[in-house]
Amino acid sequence: MKFRLVKLTAISSYSNENISFAVEYKKYFFSKWKQYYKTNWVCIDRPYSWKSDLEKCQKLLSTLKERGTTHIKTVIGK
């Protein structure tokens, strides 16, 4: 499995630039990238609000790579 960190930017309806981060994965070489985790959209002008999100995504990415993750399981309900 391959993992990557992606920075997404967009313009809101109020003409503010927003930023979000995502951790994506793919199983095989020709597979499409799928989102594993995505943060909320926040205004790019306030770095104190999005720097913690970036750190969370970087920690998640490094943990997934260190453990050599080969499977992703989603449990819905108990």
From Swiss-Prot:
Descriptive protein name: Uncharacterized 9.4 kDa protein in Gp31-cd intergenic region
Lineage, broadest ranks: Viruses, Duplodnaviria, Heunggongvirae, Uroviricota, Caudoviricetes
Source species: Enterobacteria phage T4
